[in-house]
Amino acid sequence: MATSLRITGLVKEYRAGKPVLNGIDLDIAGQGLTAIIGPSGTGKSTLLRCINRLIEPTSGEIVLKDAEGTVDLARVRGQSLRRARRRIGMVFQEYNLVERLTVMENLLTGRLGYTSALNAWMRRFDPADIERAFQLLDTVGLAGFADQRADALSGGQRQRVGIARALMQRPQLLLADEPTSSLDPKTSVEIMELLTEQGSVNGIPVLVNIHDVELARRYANRIVGMSGGHVVYDGDGKGLDATMLKTIYGGESWLE
């Protein structure tokens, strides 16, 4: 069953009367990479964090439907929320690795949602999970790095670990919050290629918040442009002409 995500009337206010997200409506269905672009402060990261319930939406619906069932992520609580979040992989801008742990240990944290508190505390993991972790390290180009500490890795290597950790969850939906913002151009391309490839291989939608319009054009089959907490564009890269980019970002100096 293909994964679908339906967002309806999503609002997020950090201060009353000043919404960061102002009535977002968005449907994501089937595999493929969707890029979210827009200026800083327009709510791109807030949107992804609402989907994964790292922050609480103020109002609206976030309905995830996949092989495990249908759940409104905006309303679910407690153990039901814990189970729902297992279905969503998240790749973070600043990697969000445990620096003192090895690469292998960081990957295995992606299975904590499936592991008892005692086994997690004792660092006891299923042999099948360990085997999968080694396979994923090979997939992301880090074979042989299992025993290296995370703080010994380059930025690109850390992001690859972050992607592998997200895939350890066997997610039905993969979110990536500015995954290339701290990387050089060559590594940024490699990370986008990896996200696109893994979305296709695993048959899941990938939703990427990205600041680089050209990378979005190159890899996304769908681009969502946000401005002022609203969706102002939803289409492919061909529709992102100078007029539309001005609508999304405001001004023209950045186009020169």
From Swiss-Prot:
ABC transporter domain ranges (all copies): 5-253
Membrane topology according to the record: Peripheral membrane protein
Catalytic activity: phosphonate(out) + ATP + H2O = phosphonate(in) + ADP + phosphate + H(+)
Keyword ATP-binding among record annotations: yes
Chain residues that bind ATP: G38, P39, S40, G41, T42, G43, K44, S45
Broad EC category: translocase
SMART domains: AAA
Family statement: Belongs to the ABC transporter superfamily. Phosphonates importer (TC 3.A.1.9.1) family.
Complex and partners: The complex is composed of two ATP-binding proteins (PhnC), two transmembrane proteins (PhnE) and a solute-binding protein (PhnD).
Protein name from the UniProt record: Phosphonates import ATP-binding protein PhnC
Organism of this sequence: Bordetella bronchiseptica (strain ATCC BAA-588 / NCTC 13252 / RB50)
Name of the gene encoding the protein in the UniProt record: phnC
